């Protein structure tokens, strides 16, 4: 059964509402006092305004604490209305993902919220818990008895000592007992953070072997990020001083090895879904035939992208751009949606053509983009590309053909904007 999932965010402050920061938490060294003065904007910001509702909700809401249930339900009903307007609303296929910037089990009105959704007979997924707030099995039993259908659990490691040291879990054995109970009773998605010399290959395989016996649904490996180009845009300090990280290639190879070993769904973040050849399915040689469906390129442009996406895009454009009308420039930032004005200042404008296609989700105001790309006196045309070029379906609701069609649709939009 494929569900349409509606995210219902209850807010919460990372770390503060998690039972303490994990040692590897991205938010651990964010200076919340200066967050309001950050120069991050987005495509939706008005010309004379640095911040709008959209980028506030994405960046600065992390310091706003938990929302009252009335606000959560109001936003949920608004989302239902939008789904109805778009023609997507069908209660039979609807699932609610109750999520938080912190640990969802610390939300003081959780029981009330779950009861509301269950009265509507909706499946409920609790979007994230570290398990640190579970001090005995009764807490897990209560969650199950309320009718929760699915839970996402940050296991980190099956070694209680590692959970205690790196997650600051005061009762790691109880957390793992609760995880076992969840796995035996409802659907469970687990996650770990891959940290060199801490969570290594042997630890991951041991954790996955136990979880397979328990009946896990999905396992997510997140690469530990410790540097600004990896996405630390809200602070200038590493999360853990002196700690190295895996390269993207090494990380993706690790995810592939784990996926080949186990039968449950395994994905990696940043985007890696080995079973579906993600990211950028259509860049692979065995799917080259699909590129024939794309329209021709007939205009010159520079395509700005991220360090991670650039190699895949170059492979695709080598095939579809026969006249070499488009050059691809990447900044050092690994994820396009986290590109900020600082990344643009590092670009050599001599390599930039008259028309520039910028990632749709880049965290820069359009007015800033114009100033930065035209500071050499050239009046360039700045166009936003699609929000996503390679759709990433975390919960596995789309088959490979649907994912390919999603990529082709995004690239048709991209080529249309290149040609306009």
Where are these regions (language model features)?
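Core AdoMet radical
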Residues: 29-107, 113, 117-135, 143-175
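Flexible, acidic/Gly-rich N-terminal and inter-domain linker regions that tether
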Residues: 1-55, 372-378
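Catalytic cores of alpha/beta
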Residues: 137-141, 196-214
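Conserved strand-turn element in the central/C-terminal portion of the radical SAM core barrel
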Residues: 160, 178-203, 225-226
């Amino acid at each position: 059964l494929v569900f349409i999932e509606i995210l219902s965010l209850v807010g919460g402050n990372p770390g503060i509402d998690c039972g303490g920061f994990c040692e590897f938490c991205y938010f651990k060294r964010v200076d919340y006092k200066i967050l309001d003065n950050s120069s991050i904007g987005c495509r939706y910001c008005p010309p004379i305004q640095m911040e709008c509702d959209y980028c506030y909700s994405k960046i600065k809401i992390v310091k706003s604490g938990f929302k009252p249930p009335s606000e959560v339900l109001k936003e949920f009903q608004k989302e239902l209305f939008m789904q109805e307007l778009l023609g997507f609303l069908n209660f039979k296929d609807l699932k609610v993902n109750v999520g938080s910037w912190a640990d969802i089990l610390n939300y003081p009105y959780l029981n009330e919220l779950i009861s509301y959704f269950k009265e509507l007979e909706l499946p409920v997924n609790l979007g994230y818990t570290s398990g640190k707030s579970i001090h005995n099995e009764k807490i897990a039993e209560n969650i199950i008895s309320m009718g929760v259908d699915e839970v996402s659990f940050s296991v980190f490691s099956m070694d209680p000592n590692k959970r205690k040291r790196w997650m600051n879990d005061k009762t790691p054995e109880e957390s793992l007992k609760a995880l076992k109970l969840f796995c035996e009773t409802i659907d469970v998605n687990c996650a770990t953070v891959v940290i060199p010399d801490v969570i290594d290959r042997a630890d991951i395989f041991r954790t996955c072997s136990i979880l397979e016996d328990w009946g896990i649904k999905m396992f997510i490996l997140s690469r530990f990020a410790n540097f600004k180009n990896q996405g630390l845009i809200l602070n200038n300090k590493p999360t853990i001083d002196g700690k190295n990280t895996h390269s993207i290639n090494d990380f993706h190879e690790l995810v592939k090895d784990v996926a080949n070993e186990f039968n449950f769904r395994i994905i990696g973040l940043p985007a890696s879904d080995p079973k579906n050849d993600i990211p950028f399915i259509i860049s692979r040689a065995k799917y080259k035939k699909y590129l024939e469906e794309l329209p021709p390129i007939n205009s010159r442009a520079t395509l700005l992208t991220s360090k991670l996406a650039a190699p895949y895009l170059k492979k695709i454009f080598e095939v579809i751009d026969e006249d070499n009308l488009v050059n691809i420039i990447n900044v050092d930032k690994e994820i396009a949606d986290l590109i900020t004005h600082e990344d643009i200042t590092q670009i050599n404008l001599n390599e930039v053509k008259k028309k520039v296609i910028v990632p749709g989700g880049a965290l820069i105001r359009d007015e800033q983009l114009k100033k930065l790309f035209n500071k050499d006196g050239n009046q360039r045309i700045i166009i936003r590309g699609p929000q996503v070029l390679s759709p990433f379906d975390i919960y596995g609701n789309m088959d490979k053909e649907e994912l390919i069609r999603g990529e082709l649709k995004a690239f048709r939009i991209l080529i249309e904007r290149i040609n306009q």
